[in-house]
Amino acid sequence: MDWTWSILFLVAAATGTYSQVQLVQSGHEVKQPGASVKVSCKASGYSFTTYGMNWVPQAPGQGLEWMGWFNTYTGNPTYAQGFTGRFVFSMDTSASTAYLQISSLKAEDMAMYYCAR
């Protein structure tokens, strides 16, 4: 019976640990074509440089699309095809925050942009 409680405790402890991970993004913004926007994603509950940060836009009426990821350990970005040039991933390690900057906004950039660990 003791081993059963140990297993249950380990499962509960693991669940509690993961539930503390949070990614908090900057608020909603409306910009005009040609403008720039910088979206932030503040991480907490884990070591920021242990996991990469993915960026995933969702255009109105469309599914999620992976636009790339940022290696928070090395600082190297990887961009999916179609997301180069105007799109820049960056980070502030001391603030555990990742950023997505989009310049020269176009109508087709209209989407919700999500960060994902």
Swiss-Prot record:
Keywords: Adaptive immunity, Cell membrane, Disulfide bond, Glycoprotein, Immunity, Immunoglobulin, Immunoglobulin domain, Membrane, Secreted, Signal. Residues 45-52 are annotated as: Complementarity-determining-1. Residues 20-117 form the Ig-like domain. Residues 70-77 are annotated as: Complementarity-determining-2. Glycans are attached at N76. Residues 20-44 are annotated as: Framework-1. It is found in: Secreted; Cell membrane. Pfam families: V-set (PF07686). Immunoglobulins are composed of two identical heavy chains and two identical light chains; disulfide-linked. Its main location: secreted. One of its GO terms (biological process) is immunoglobulin mediated immune response. InterPro entries: Ig-like_dom (IPR007110), Ig-like_dom_sf (IPR036179), Ig-like_fold (IPR013783), Ig_V-set (IPR013106), IgHV (IPR050199). PROSITE patterns: IG_LIKE (PS50835). SUPFAM superfamilies: Immunoglobulin. It comes from the Eukaryota. SMART domains: IGv (SM00406). This is Probable non-functional immunoglobulin heavy variable 7-81. The keyword Signal applies. Disulfide bonds join C41-C115. It comes from Homo sapiens. Residues 53-69 are annotated as: Framework-2.
